[in-house]
């Protein structure tokens, strides 16, 4: 159905001037905000040279921030800034070679870990600011933006290039600042002029060129001095730019591009941060209650004259203040985008490929009441107390996606440090009752903002011999503590790239474990999704690929890689050495291991060398043992292929996770991993009758603004472990759930556990790890290591034997916790136990509603797992289903929406016949389908035939949504076929039996283009239904069994067969 398009709103134009008279040339952003307040979340502005589409509503911003549809546009003021910033990171097009090259080279220098190295240098400059303020006479004014500009310029100069501008020792601004400010101002004003005006302003042009040459001269001297000094073990931005090649191309940056990068960092690295600091001070002075809280935190945390790195990281409220300051006045107020293809946003606004320039107006986005509430103009740092609740795509102070500000961590750490030190030493006074006047060049800052200060306590009034070694010494001590003798000689000369394709996180988890294992031996490792390494694979070192299949198709983060692999010519991957491991489920025999097998074959066909045989693990078999066996063989093969040797003197492995008890709070990273949001429970009711001994819940949740879904989508839920199991763990290890701890890891990337920040043991065990999965052999082997009691040690070792493990552990679902309670002689430490537990996985539920009925709410249908434990002891309760069953109205859950890669959506043509098979909770997605069909019928659309095959035990006990389904049949929406397996006086009947009865009609429908959908149990029901259909096709068309199988495969390949089943990885 063709989308109805609408014209984008536009203010009144003024002939050839367009909308220019509406724009204040000195404060264009404020003009845009005023227009947005009148015209809404999207409007267009006609300038002298082009038309700009300005977007500020968070739903529209979410669309234009989709990097598959839009990319950064270097237009307007940024295009003018290229005169002196060239193809630096900020002003280059994404497709320009130097952007990707510089991005790859410089990313490590802006990681959170790198901030530790910069911290002492940041303190060095911050001390100079404190000393300056401490020496002021009473009633002398402080020009806040001017001093913040001095501070931030000196900081980026020292940290980035080991160059001292010494701004605090000058009466006037450094010449670079003068030239830069004039050049930025001129770049912005060039946009406001007619061509004839621009040509006549020859003096301005001459000054512009002079300023550019002045900046070039300073930067070229910095580069020349570094080269002449031999780059004596510097490890800063300049050193990396001069010496480090791009890991993808092997090329280094040329001198001209280094010049552009330095200018980019000198501008972007200080202008935006100085504005942030100035706005933060302004907002604190205007909000005394927030200033009081900030002083309280600073006095509690900063107990030394100069803050340590760890102390700055504890300034949580200060970071919230900075985030809220950036919300109200983001110092980089906009970013521009263009569409990669003709498209439509907001369901009705057409955007032309490459022609239409879109500008995201960030200050107005940050004032979107639909996302932030009605109090958007109030300064409320508490909005950022729980980052998971910050509205998605409604907060963009650092830009978007891969083109977001690379220096975000640098800016926030510097600003937090400086604000902390200023409040530590000074009382801030708004002596003139300053009224905000926003000044704009390329960035925003308060204009003519002056304050006075009074000393709070003994300040740093004399030059301090800074000891940047404090944090470094602590780090060195930690490193010495965790260093161990490497078990493999030569591993430090090897590099390893681990690629994964994963929809549910299992394959990704294996990939990260492989990288961690190698990293602990000194191997240089990298872990990324398959789609993120399109275009090149390294010919040095090893490549490991871990992937699953989804109904025979690549996972969502692997499809592009598979397509790229197909298009390569023979021998293009010659020199690449690789191995593949596949995750799957043998119940889907026709597609089992299809994608891992295909990638393995394609890699070999394109010239790569397989250094170890492909491994397979079956989710319905002994998955863990198959994985362990493959890892053992693969590492052995890798040692032979890369000439490595085993170190006979290796130390016994110990935990890489360390734990420290503290008294502060922290949080969980899993919600951020899945980009999850909070959703409120609206309804939670039982679907089974009171006479049933089982439970199925109908649960409705409200969606936050901006969240969308369609029929056939999944709701991913991040569950919470039961209080009963958590208490068992706490009791076993003698711990108190209220205790706060800080966890730190050495040599591993443990992504699911909150590291380096305080978290309670209760929260840690509730939200981070799986505690009742069957114990793995690796866990049991570790228990053996920590068990001294000979009888217990022998019993544990026996569980590892072939057959015993499968019968006694897997089949009975005996967890590591069960074993620890049984074998009290095992003295494993809590942190090692925690490290061995896998990440708490989201549970996916088929959505059982249609957005056509209510776009801001959805429902799921949850079968509650609560039955006698297979071990014969007690009751087994499903983690997620019981958690959800116990939620009440207005309770919040953490969840996210995913679209499965399985053709599970209604046909585009509503007249296409559909066949739906969904016994039990498999009815869920079809309820959404039927809601959509009812709306389509109400709109007068003609509907094709629809057959629903539903099964349950008894019509009076577990006939889910019975009244709805019977009404749907009465109203002509479906033909309903029900199978009852526990009805007294009748044989057990399942859905496949009914399908067999209707086989002639169903095969005819499928032969004529009908769509087939199966939802439910993938281990038994779905394969039986497939077998029944293939047997029917074989009988009716008189073909072989293989030809019938090929027919069903073709139906799936044509996109007419969708499966949504519980089995598989």
From Swiss-Prot:
Names of required cofactors: heme; FAD; FMN
Primary enzyme class: oxidoreductase
Cellular compartments per GO CC: cytosol
Keywords per UniProt: Electron transport, FAD, Flavoprotein, FMN, Heme, Iron, Metal-binding, Monooxygenase, Multifunctional enzyme, NADP, Oxidoreductase, Transport
Region called Cytochrome P450, residue ranges: 1-479
Ranges for domain FAD-binding FR-type: 674-907
EC number: 1.14.14.1, 1.6.2.4
Record-annotated site: Important for catalytic activity: 272
Binding locations of heme: 405
Binding site for FMN: 502-507, 549-552, 583-585, 591-593
Region (NADPH--P450 reductase): 480-1065
Gene Ontology MF: a single term: oxidoreductase activity
UniProt catalytic activity: 2 oxidized [cytochrome P450] + NADPH = 2 reduced [cytochrome P450] + NADP(+) + H(+); an organic molecule + reduced [NADPH--hemoprotein reductase] + O2 = an alcohol + oxidized [NADPH--hemoprotein reductase] + H2O + H(+)
Flavodoxin-like domain segment(s): 496-635
InterPro entries: Bifunctional_P450_P450_red, CysJ-like_FAD-binding, Cyt_P450, Cyt_P450_CS, Cyt_P450_sf, FAD-bd_FR_type, Flavdoxin-like, Flavodoxin/NO_synth
Cited function: Functions as a fatty acid monooxygenase. Catalyzes hydroxylation of fatty acids at omega-1, omega-2 and omega-3 positions, yielding primarily omega-1 and omega-2 hydroxylated products. Metabolizes unsaturated and saturated fatty acids as well as N-acylamino acids. Has a preference for long-chain unsaturated fatty acids over saturated fatty acids. Shows activity toward saturated fatty acids with a chain length of 9-18 carbons with preference for longer fatty acids.
Family classification: In the N-terminal section; belongs to the cytochrome P450 family.
The protein, known as: Bifunctional cytochrome P450/NADPH--P450 reductase
Organism expressing this protein natively: Bacillus cereus (strain ATCC 14579 / DSM 31 / CCUG 7414 / JCM 2152 / NBRC 15305 / NCIMB 9373 / NCTC 2599 / NRRL B-3711)
Primary gene name: CYP102A5
């Amino acid at each position: 159905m063709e989308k109805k398009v609408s014209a984008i709103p536009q203010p009144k134009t003024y002939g050839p001037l367009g909308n220019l008279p509406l724009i204040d040339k000195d404060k264009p952003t404020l003009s845009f905000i005023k227009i947005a307040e009148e015209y809404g979340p999207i409007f267009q502005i006609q300038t002298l040279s082009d038309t700009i589409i300005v977007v500020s509503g968070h739903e529209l911003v979410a669309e234009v921030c989709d990097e598959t549809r839009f990319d950064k546009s270097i237009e307007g003021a940024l295009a003018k800034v290229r005169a002196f910033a060239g193809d630096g990171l900020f002003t280059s097009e994404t497709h320009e070679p130097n952007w990707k090259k510089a991005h790859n080279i410089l990313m490590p220098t802006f990681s959170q870990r790198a901030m530790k190295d910069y911290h002492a240098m940041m303190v060095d400059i911050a001390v100079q600011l404190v000393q300056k303020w401490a020496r002021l006479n009473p009633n002398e004014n402080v020009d806040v933006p001017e001093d913040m500009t001095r501070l931030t310029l000196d900081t980026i100069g020292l940290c980035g290039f080991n160059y001292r501008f010494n701004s605090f020792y000058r009466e006037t601004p450094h010449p670079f600042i003068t030239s830069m400010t004039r050049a930025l101002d001129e770049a912005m004003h060039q946009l406001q002029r007619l061509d004839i005006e621009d040509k006549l302003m020859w003096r301005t042009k001459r000054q512009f060129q002079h300023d550019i040459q002045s900046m070039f001269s300073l930067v070229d001297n910095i580069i020349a001095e570094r080269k002449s000094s031999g780059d004596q073990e510097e490890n800063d931005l300049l050193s990396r730019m001069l010496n480090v090649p791009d890991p993808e191309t092997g090329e280094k940056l040329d001198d001209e591009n280094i010049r552009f990068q330095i200018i980019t960092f000198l501008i972007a690295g200080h202008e935006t941060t100085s504005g942030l600091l100035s706005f933060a001070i302004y907002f604190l002075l205007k909000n005394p209650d927030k200033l009081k809280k900030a002083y309280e935190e600073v006095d509690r945390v900063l107990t030394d004259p100069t803050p340590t790195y760890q102390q700055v990281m504890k300034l949580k409220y200060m970071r919230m203040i900075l985030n809220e300051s950036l919300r109200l006045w983001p110092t980089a107020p906009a970013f521009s985008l263009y569409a990669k293809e003709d498209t439509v946003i907001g369901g009705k606004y057409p955007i032309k490929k490459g022609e239409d320039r879109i500008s995201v107006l960030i200050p107005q986005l940050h004032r979107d009441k639909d996302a932030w509430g009605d109090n958007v103009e109030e300064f409320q740092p508490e909005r950022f107390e729980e980052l998971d609740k910050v509205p998605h795509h409604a907060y963009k102070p650092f830009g978007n996606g891969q083109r977001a500000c690379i220096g975000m961590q640098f800016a926030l750490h510097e600003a937090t440090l400086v604000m902390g030190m200023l409040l530590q030493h000074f009382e801030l006074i708004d002596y003139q009752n300053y009224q905000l006047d926003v000044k704009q060049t390329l960035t925003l800052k308060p204009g003519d903002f002056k304050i006075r200060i009074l000393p709070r306590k003994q300040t740093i009034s004399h030059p301090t011999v800074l000891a940047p070694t404090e944090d470094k010494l602590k780090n060195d001590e930690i490193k010495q503590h965790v260093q161990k003798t490497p078990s493999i000689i030569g591993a430090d000369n090897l590099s390893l790239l681990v690629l994964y394709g994963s929809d549910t996180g299992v394959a990704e988890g294996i990939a990260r474990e492989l990288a961690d294992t190698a990293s602990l031996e000194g191997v240089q490792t990298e872990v990324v999704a398959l789609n993120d390494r399109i275009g090149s694979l390294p010919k040095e070192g090893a490549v490991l690929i871990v992937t699953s299949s989804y109904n025979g198709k690549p996972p969502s983060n692997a499809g592009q890689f598979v397509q790229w692999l197909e298009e390569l010519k023979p021998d293009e991957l010659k020199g690449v050495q690789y191995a593949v491991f596949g995750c799957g489920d043998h119940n889907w025999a026709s597609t089992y291991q299809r994608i891992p097998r295909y990638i393995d074959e394609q890699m070999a066909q394109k010239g790569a060398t397989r250094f170890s045989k492909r491994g397979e693990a079956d989710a319905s078999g002994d998955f863990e043992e198959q994985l362990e066996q493959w890892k053992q063989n693969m590492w052995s093969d890798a040692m032979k292929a890369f000439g490595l040797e085993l170190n006979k003197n290796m130390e016994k492995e110990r935990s890489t996770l360390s734990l420290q008890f503290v008294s502060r709070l922290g949080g969980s990273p899993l919600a951020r991993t899945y980009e999850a949001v909070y959703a409120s429970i609206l309804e939670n009711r039982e679907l089974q009758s009171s006479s049933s001994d089982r439970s199925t819940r109908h649960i409705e949740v409200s969606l936050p603004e901006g969240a969308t879904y369609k029929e056939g989508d999944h709701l991913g839920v991040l569950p919470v472990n039961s209080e009963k199991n958590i208490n068992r763990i706490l009791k076993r290890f003698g711990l108190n759930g209220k205790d706060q701890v800080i966890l730190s890891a050495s040599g591993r990337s443990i992504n699911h556990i909150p590291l380096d920040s305080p978290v309670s043991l209760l929260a840690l065990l509730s939200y981070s790890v799986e505690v009742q999965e069957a114990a793995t052999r690796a866990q049991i082997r570790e228990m053996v290591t920590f068990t001294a009691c000979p009888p217990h040690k022998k019993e544990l070792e026996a569980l590892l034997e072939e057959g015993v493990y499968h019968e006694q552990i897997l089949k009975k679902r005996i967890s590591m916790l069960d074993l620890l309670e049984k074998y009290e002689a095992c003295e494993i430490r809590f942190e090692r136990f925690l490290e061995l537990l896998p990440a708490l996985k989201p549970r996916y539920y088929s959505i059982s509603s249609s957005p056509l009925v209510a776009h801001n709410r959805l429902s799921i249908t949850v079968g509650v797992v609560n039955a006698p434990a297979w071990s014969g002891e007690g009751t087994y309760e499903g983690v997620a289903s019981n958690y959800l069953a116990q939620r009440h109205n207005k309770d919040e859950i953490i969840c996210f929406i995913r679209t499965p890669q399985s053709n599970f959506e209604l046909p585009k043509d509503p007249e296409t016949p559909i066949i739906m098979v969904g016994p039990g909770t498999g009815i869920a997605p079809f309820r959404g389908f039927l809601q959509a069909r009812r709306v389509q019928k109400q709109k007068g659309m003609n509907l094709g035939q629809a057959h629903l095959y539903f099964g349950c035990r008894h019509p009076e006990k577990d006939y889910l949504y019975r009244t709805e389904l019977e009404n749907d049949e009465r109203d002509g929406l479906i033909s309903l076929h029900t199978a009852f397996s526990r009805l007294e006086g009748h044989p057990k009947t399942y859905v496949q039996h009914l399908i067999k009865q209707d086989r002639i009609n169903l095969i005819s429908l499928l032969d004529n283009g009908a769509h087939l959908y199966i939802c439910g149990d993938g281990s038994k029901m779905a394969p039986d239904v497939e077998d029944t259909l293939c047997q029917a096709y074989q009988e009716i068309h008189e073909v072989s069994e293989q030809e019938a199988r090929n027919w069903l495969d073709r139906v799936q390949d044509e996109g007419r067969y969708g499966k949504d089943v519980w089995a598989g990885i």
